[in-house]
């Protein structure tokens, strides 16, 4: 039996999604909880591996099991065995053709900037604080050059293991909600650190340090060293993963919960 789960988590206390020896990871905690409920070892596959400090409201995973449980038993049982900063949002049995990573047709991230003179207290791990005067409209305008299938070498991490730097960005929007600036971006897939590297460069434009045309210049240069520093991890959320309709996976509010949808 193959089971898909929708997961949300606060990534600030973990060394990323991927299971690693001797450090705490989201995957490790989920596999431990699932193995208790299934009464057998469980291995997980995810839609997107998030880095240390990065959060998710719409992560999707799947696993195979011999255990027979109803959806409520999986949800309640796993949540009861998880730490408070990880939660199962939904459970659905899927056919064997489904794969959390390879069946996905798009991923969507939101990067939340707290734009204020002083740092936040309550949301300090859920937003990235930048105190300069950020022009979100300029960031949005500059970001439109990223649309379509392009070579994103200038925005990939040096350690990125992808065989190709080409990705297809479906949409990118930058909006302001009071003190928050939100970068909302969807693509077929993302390179390692791609979203945070894009945000870092857009911030340079929003702060007035670079012209509107800079994003296009960076794309053409195909040189990571010419782009801005990688934006902080705390403001980044994996909010949605798109799959073919045949799987009929649940659709929930994207989040994060303190943002307007």
UniProtKB/Swiss-Prot annotation:
<dbReference type="GO" id="GO:0160147">
    <property type="term" value="F:tRNA pseudouridine(38-40) synthase activity"/>
</dbReference>
<dbReference type="InterPro" id="IPR020103">
    <property type="entry name" value="PsdUridine_synth_cat_dom_sf"/>
</dbReference>
<keyword id="KW-0413">Isomerase</keyword>
<dbReference type="GO" id="GO:0003723">
    <property type="term" value="F:RNA binding"/>
</dbReference>
<comment type="similarity">
    <text>Belongs to the tRNA pseudouridine synthase TruA family.</text>
</comment>
<feature type="binding site">
    <location>
        <position position="109"/>
    </location>
    <ligand>
        <name>substrate</name>
    </ligand>
</feature>
<comment type="function">
    <text>Formation of pseudouridine at positions 38, 39 and 40 in the anticodon stem and loop of transfer RNAs.</text>
</comment>
<dbReference type="Pfam" id="PF01416">
    <property type="entry name" value="PseudoU_synth_1"/>
</dbReference>
<dbReference type="InterPro" id="IPR020097">
    <property type="entry name" value="PsdUridine_synth_TruA_a/b_dom"/>
</dbReference>
<comment type="subunit">
    <text>Homodimer.</text>
</comment>
<feature type="active site" description="Nucleophile">
    <location>
        <position position="51"/>
    </location>
</feature>
<keyword id="KW-0819">tRNA processing</keyword>
<protein>
    <recommendedName>
        <fullName>tRNA pseudouridine synthase A</fullName>
        <ecNumber>5.4.99.12</ecNumber>
    </recommendedName>
</protein>
<dbReference type="GO" id="GO:0031119">
    <property type="term" value="P:tRNA pseudouridine synthesis"/>
</dbReference>
<dbReference type="InterPro" id="IPR001406">
    <property type="entry name" value="PsdUridine_synth_TruA"/>
</dbReference>
<dbReference type="InterPro" id="IPR020094">
    <property type="entry name" value="TruA/RsuA/RluB/E/F_N"/>
</dbReference>
<dbReference type="InterPro" id="IPR020095">
    <property type="entry name" value="PsdUridine_synth_TruA_C"/>
</dbReference>
């Amino acid at each position: 039996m193959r089971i898909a789960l929708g997961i949300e988590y606060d990534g600030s206390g973990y060394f990323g999604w991927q299971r690693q020896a001797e450090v705490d990871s989201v995957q490790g905690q989920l596999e431990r909880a699932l193995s208790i409920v299934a009464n057998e070892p469980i291995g997980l596959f995810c839609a997107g591996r998030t880095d240390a400090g990065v959060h998710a409201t719409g992560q999707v995973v799947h696993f195979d099991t011999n255990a027979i449980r109803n959806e409520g038993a999986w949800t309640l049982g796993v949540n009861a065995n998880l730490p408070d900063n990880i939660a199962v949002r939904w459970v659905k049995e899927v056919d064997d053709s489904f794969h959390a990573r390879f069946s996905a047709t798009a991923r969507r991230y939101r990067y939340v900037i707290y734009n204020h003179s002083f740092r936040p207290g309550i949301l300090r791990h859920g937003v990235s604080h930048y105190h300069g005067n950020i022009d979100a409209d300029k960031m949005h305008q500059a970001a439109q050059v990223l649309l379509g299938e392009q070579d994103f070498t200038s925005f990939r991490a040096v350690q990125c293991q992808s065989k190709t730097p080409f990705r297809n960005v479906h949409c990118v929007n930058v909006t302001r909600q009071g003190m928050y600036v939100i970068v909302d971006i969807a693509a077929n897939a993302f390179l390692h650190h791609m979203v945070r590297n894009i945000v870092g460069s857009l911030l340079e434009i929003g702060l007035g340090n670079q012209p509107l045309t800079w994003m296009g210049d960076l794309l053409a240069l195909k040189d990571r060293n010419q782009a801005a520093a990688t934006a902080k991890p705390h403001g980044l959320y994996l909010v949605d993963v798109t799959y073919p309709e045949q799987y009929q996976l649940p659709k929930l509010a994207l989040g994060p919960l303190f943002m307007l949808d």
